Amino acid sequence: MRIILLGAPGAGKGTQAQNIMKKFGIPQISTGDMLRAAVKAGSPLGLKVKEVMATGGLVSDETIIALVKDRIKEDDCANGFLFDGFPRTIPQAEALREAGVKIDHVVEIAVDDQEIIKRLSGRRVHEASGRVYHVDYNPPKVEGKDDVTGEPLVQREDDKEETVRKRLEVYHSQTAPLVDYYRSWAEKDADAAPEYLRVEGVGSVDEIRDRVFTGLQK
């Protein structure tokens, strides 16, 4: 089972990725982890990556595809893999296709922007313990205070509405076009293209998990 998982920040991809990995016995592959591992290993490719990252540059798609091809040859990918955060752009998706990397399913966890803004901007955190609350879905007993210590809760910078809106803008301009790319490829050439699966990302974690599994096991 070779899967690409797509969805906006706050759509619940992380939770569903864990469910998919457990169910199908496949590793989650993120480009960040691959880049760090290559640098640590000190391979020729890793040294190249280190050089680019040291100057604050962007690692080329060609280098990332080379890393992907090496990574999926490893033993833990015998049953497949789950790509998280890759591909991010249509050129990366095309490079993956041209490199002959076979993908079985592209899963999109679909949640509308207003719901994501509500989910993320409503989060409150107790910094010392890491306890997370939500003003609507999981409120503290006393507004703005941690249940255990009574200390004040904070809203992380990443969860502020303005920041969430900016992150969504980036997603819509860069990654959302991938949905159209894979959908249209599946319509034109169903035999060669990955199966495109759109899963409604609103509901309980278990409901969404069941939708994902049902779609993948059709």
Curated annotation (Swiss-Prot):
Localization in the cell: Cytoplasm
UniProt key word Calcium: no
Name of the molecule in the record: Adenylate kinase
Residue numbers spanned by region LID: 122-159
Origin species: Hahella chejuensis (strain KCTC 2396)
Quaternary structure annotation from Swiss-Prot or TrEMBL: Monomer.
Catalytic activity: AMP + ATP = 2 ADP
UniProt xrefs under Pfam families: ADK (PF00406), ADK_lid (PF05191)
Function summary: Catalyzes the reversible transfer of the terminal phosphate group between ATP and AMP. Plays an important role in cellular energy homeostasis and in adenine nucleotide metabolism.
Keyword Zinc assigned: no
Domain remark in the UniProt entry: Consists of three domains, a large central CORE domain and two small peripheral domains, NMPbind and LID, which undergo movements during catalysis. The LID domain closes over the site of phosphoryl transfer upon ATP binding. Assembling and dissambling the active center during each catalytic cycle provides an effective means to prevent ATP hydrolysis.
Residue sites binding ATP per the record: 10-15, 123, 132-133, 203
GO molecular function: adenylate kinase activity; ATP binding
One GO-annotated biological process of the protein: AMP salvage
Residues that, per the record, bind AMP: 31, 36, 57-59, 85-88, 92, 156, 167
The protein's enzyme class: transferase
Gene3D superfamilies: P-loop containing nucleotide triphosphate hydrolases
Family stated for the protein in its record: Belongs to the adenylate kinase family.
Associated pathway: Purine metabolism; AMP biosynthesis via salvage pathway; AMP from ADP: step 1/1
